């Protein structure tokens, strides 16, 4: 198995976060109550901010990324049951947390670790809020 470079890891995260924006926007449009709308607006804001942070991080590294979007949004929106969509969204947020942890374990400098940690924290918060909503 080939070891991914830090740049490749961050590009992959950015592609996933772009898909997260699309998924959150779609879920926001389908929200049926104010609590769900507030939750999806929170997630959407977090995904947008993550895209901005990752984009700036890549620029600091001397690259711009791929411009591609992951397929996660399609998977989320293909589900018919709202709770299943939200559970998959949680899994996607957990995936991002794992990938950030893996990227940090490669030993980058604080100029990379700090923005990744900020994204991780936001995802941890959103995971908790989504789980609370499902209860």
Write out the residue ranges for each language-model feature.
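Alpha-helical bundle segments that constitute or directly flank the non-heme di-iron/ferroxidase center
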Residues: 1-31, 83-107, 121
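Alpha-helical scaffold segments that form or flank carboxylate-/histidine-based iron centers
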Residues: 4-13, 32-52, 80-86, 111-124
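Long, non-catalytic architectural segments outside compact domain cores
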Residues: 12, 19, 23-26, 42, ...
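Alpha-helix boundary/capping and short turn/kink residues
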Residues: 33, 63, 106-110
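Conserved alpha-helical segments that form or flank metal/cofactor-binding pockets of metalloenzymes
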Residues: 37-69, 126-135
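Carboxylate-rich helix-loop segments that flank metal/cofactor sites and access channels
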Residues: 52-98
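A generic hydrophobic-segment detector
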Residues: 103-135
């Amino acid at each position: 198995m080939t070891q991914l470079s830090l740049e490749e890891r961050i590009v992959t995260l950015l592609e996933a976060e772009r898909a997260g924006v699309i998924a959150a926007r779609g879920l926001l449009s389908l929200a049926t109550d104010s609590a769900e709308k507030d939750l999806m607006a929170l997630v959407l804001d977090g995904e947008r901010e993550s895209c901005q942070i990752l984009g700036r991080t890549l620029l600091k590294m001397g690259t711009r990324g791929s411009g591609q979007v992951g397929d996660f949004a399609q998977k989320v929106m293909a589900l018919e049951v709202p709770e299943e969509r939200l559970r998959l969204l949680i899994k996607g947020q957990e995936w991002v947390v794992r990938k950030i942890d893996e990227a940090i374990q490669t030993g980058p400098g604080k100029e990379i670790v700090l923005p990744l940690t900020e994204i991780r924290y936001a995802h941890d918060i959103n995971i908790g809020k989504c789980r609370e909503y499902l209860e």
